[in-house]
């Protein structure tokens, strides 16, 4: 029971031949990367606006004398994890976990001297949240011979100046390239093209595609929703079909997003979903989280650590938060599930 002929164009890692309405950003990136000296770039914009696609497409078109290294900072969210990934990418060898950070740094520096290298730090917000700017500081210090360029991809940071210390920023001096949210018309165009490549002919009604495009600006979520629906029906997809699958598709999207994180991330998210009225104060979330931990035989984390995990959920776009200062209780954070997933 499926309307899918070709899975690939609906997968999140698929890189199309052309990227909808991102020509100016593509040209800006390509022009920067064609410089004699590799630049440092901050590519920023909301989730699902083509940042990763742009980067993945362009690194395949680099000159032959430039080696590129792609690091997903969701999976490599500390300096040591990112350095291990970088060392493996440079050398083609497995990197033992026992390597000390300083030893990894020395081995990497030796390799970087020989040819030009471009390092992509995708989802860099997770690295900055967990580990501050230690990796960027290290990379900025070995960037002197201009053999190294860095692309920092961020969904939440429009300017690194507020995220990293002054000496690191002054050395990096990244060029800023931003992507704006897609309009519903642009989302429609993207989903329509992917559906044409993936689904059986006449299996998606026009009004269904219009509804899907208007319901989300995040193309990743839209593609997941379309894929989930097409895989679980044998009838042409109507607007009503999408409404029926919306809750389950969003649930699966969240599960997939959190699959690379800990049980505590999933437990925390479940605790946030337990309430009927939002927003909810962080103190109420902590209490409900501990109750879930007892039921699951998990040792609860400290409030400080849970505060970090709340930021992880926010970085993924799964929740929205607002912090208030002052008043009887001092600093208060209010939390609610993302409006995109309602």
Residue ranges, per PLM feature:
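A short, basic N-terminal segment
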Residues: 1-39, 60-61
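Mid-core helix/loop region of P-loop NTP-binding domains shared across ATPases and GTPases
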Residues: 11, 55, 75-187, 201-226, ...
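Walker A/P-loop nucleotide-binding motif
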Residues: 37-57
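A short hydrophobic beta-strand->loop->alpha-helix junction that borders the nucleotide-binding pocket
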Residues: 45-47, 68-78
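Conserved C-terminal helix/linker of AAA+ ATPases
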Residues: 232-253
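Short alpha-helical segments that sit at the start of domains
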Residues: 246-269, 278
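Short amphipathic alpha-helical interface segments
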Residues: 263-291
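Terminal-proximal interaction/regulatory segments of ATP-powered molecular machines
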Residues: 280-342
């Amino acid at each position: 029971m499926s309307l899918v002929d070709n899975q690939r164009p609906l997968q999140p890692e698929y890189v199309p031949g052309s990227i909808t309405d991102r020509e100016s950003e593509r040209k800006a990136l390509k022009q920067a990367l064609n410089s004699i000296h590799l630049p440092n770039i901050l590519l920023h914009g909301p989730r699902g606006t083509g940042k990763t696609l742009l980067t993945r497409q362009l690194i395949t078109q680099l000159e032959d004398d430039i080696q590129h290294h792609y690091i997903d900072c969701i999976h490599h969210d500390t300096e040591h994890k990112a350095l291990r990934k970088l060392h493996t990418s440079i050398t083609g060898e497995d990197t033992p976990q026992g390597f000390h950070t300083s030893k990894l740094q020395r081995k990497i520096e030796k390799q970087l001297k020989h040819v030009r290298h471009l390092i992509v730090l995708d989802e860099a917000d997770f690295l900055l949240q967990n580990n501050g700017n230690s990796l960027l500081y290290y990379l900025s210090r070995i960037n002197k011979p201009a053999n190294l360029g860095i692309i920092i991809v961020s969904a939440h940071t429009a300017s690194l100046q507020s995220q990293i210390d002054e000496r690191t920023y002054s050395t990096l001096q990244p060029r800023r390239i931003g992507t704006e949210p897609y309009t519903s018309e642009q989302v429609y165009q993207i989903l329509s093209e992917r559906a044409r490549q993936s689904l059986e002919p006449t299996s998606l009604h026009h009004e269904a595609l219009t509804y899907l495009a208007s319901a989300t600006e995040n193309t990743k979520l839209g593609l997941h929703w379309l894929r989930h629906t097409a895989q679980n029906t044998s009838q042409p997809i109507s607007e009503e079909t999408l409404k029926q699958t919306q809750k389950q598709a969003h649930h699966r999207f969240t599960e997939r997003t959190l699959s690379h994180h800990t049980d505590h991330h999933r437990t925390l998210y479940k605790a946030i979903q337990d309430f009927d009225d939002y927003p909810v104060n962080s103190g109420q979330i902590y209490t409900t989280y501990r109750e879930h931990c007892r039921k699951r035989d998990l040792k609860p984390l400290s409030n400080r650590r849970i505060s970090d995990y709340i930021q992880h959920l926010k970085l993924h776009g799964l929740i929205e938060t607002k912090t208030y200062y002052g008043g009887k209780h001092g600093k208060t954070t209010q939390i609610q599930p993302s409006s995109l997933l309602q």
